[in-house]
Amino acid sequence: MSAFKRTHYDLNRPGLLHQQVAMAEFIELGHFQSTIRQARATYAQRRQALLQALAPCLGLQAHISGTEQGLHLCLHLPHNLDDVALAQQAQDHGLTVRALSRYAIARNDLRGLVIGYGYAPLEAIQKDGPVLAQLVLRALRHRHA
C-alpha cells in the first residue's frame, strides 16, 4: 500500500464520525472551555506555589523566567555553578529537574534548572519546593566558598 493510500485511509477511516460528533457537542455545550479554564486555574496555583518556594533563592545571582506561560519555568543561575551536579542532588532527594546547560548548544555559559510543574500535584510542590530551594541556596553559597 502506498503512503498516499495509507494516509487517505487514516484520514477517512470508518468510526471517526461518531467521535467528531461527540467532540462537537462537547465544545458546543461549553464543556471544553470549562475544562480549559479549570486546567489554567490548577496550573496557575502550581506555578504560584513553586515561585513562592523558590523566592528565597532570588536575589543571590538567580532569577526566574518562563512564568508567563507553559508548564515549566527556568531558574537561571551563575555561569560558574555546576547545574548538572545540582540537578543530580535534586534527583538524589527525589526531585526531577533538568540542568539548563544540557539544553544549550551554541552557548556554554548558561546554567540553571528547568523545573516542570504540570505533572506535580500542588501538595507535592508545597512540600518539595522548599527542599529544592535549600539545595539551590546551598549551591549558591558553596560556589563562593
Name each region found by the language model.
Residues 92, 106-145:
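PLP-dependent enzyme catalytic core of the Aspartate aminotransferase-like
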Residues 28, 76-78, 118-120:
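Residue-level recognition of strand-loop junctions within catalytic nucleotide-signaling folds
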Residues 1-40:
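Conserved core segment of the aminotransferase class I/II
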Residues 41-51, 62-76, 86:
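Conserved glycine-rich beta-strand-loop-beta hairpin in the small C-terminal domain of fold type I
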